[in-house]
């Protein structure tokens, strides 16, 4: 979507849009296996991967837009992520998607996986991977925030502003409150 946004920005600024940007943006291919699961790359055949690249096509990019395809992709790739060297952000992406699909149990499981193995003493900062001692990993921390704000609370940034989409909370959570959003400092609440 970066090319799409670049084209939109150029138009807003009354700048010419290079034809190649639009051409490439319209012709990006999403590869799939015969069963419809999105393929990591052209020669991918099920081996271990570092992170959830394919699943970023479902959230936050929305190239894979329907929930059924997103779920199939998540179920396929969740056990393909390297458990020792995969970054925390993969599971936060899964958390957002499951929370928005209404699967509170699976969303919470992914939420825990997105930070618990990566916590480092003495301050509880997040390392990049479960085996890394290199804190502070800001992408992982950002993913953790997205899991709560965009996943459990359901907030989505759109061209029209911030919207609250349907989502669910874990069974033992009562509510999530996100305050001070946008220039109007709005408050959003998701209750069980």
Describe every region a protein language model picked out.
Residues 105-192:
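Non-catalytic C-terminal accessory modules of carbohydrate-active enzymes
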Residues 1:
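Conserved active-site neighborhood of enzyme catalytic/cofactor-binding cores
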Residues 4, 8, 12-141:
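Active-site core of glycosidic bond-cleaving carbohydrate-active enzymes
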């Amino acid at each position: 979507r970066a090319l799409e946004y670049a084209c939109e920005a150029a138009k807003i600024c009354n700048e010419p849009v290079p034809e190649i940007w639009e051409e490439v943006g319209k012709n990006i291919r999403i590869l799939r296996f015969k069963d419809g699961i999105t393929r990591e790359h052209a020669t991918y055949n099920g081996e271990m991967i570092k992170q959830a690249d394919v699943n970023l096509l479902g959230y936050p990019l929305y190239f894979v837009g329907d929930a059924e395809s997103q779920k199939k992709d998540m179920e396929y790739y969740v056990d393909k992520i390297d458990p020792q060297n995969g970054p925390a952000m993969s599971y936060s992406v899964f958390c957002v998607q499951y929370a928005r699909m209404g699967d509170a149990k699976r969303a919470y499981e992914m939420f825990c996986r997105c930070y618990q193995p990566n916590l480092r003493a003495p301050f509880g900062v997040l390392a990049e991977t479960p085996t890394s001692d290199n804190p502070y990993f800001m992408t992982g921390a950002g993913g953790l925030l997205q899991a709560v704000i965009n996943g459990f609370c359901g907030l989505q940034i759109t061209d029209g502003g911030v919207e609250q989409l349907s989502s669910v909370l874990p069974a033992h959570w009562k509510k999530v409150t996100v305050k001070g959003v946008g220039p109007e400092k709005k408050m959003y609440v998701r209750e069980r």
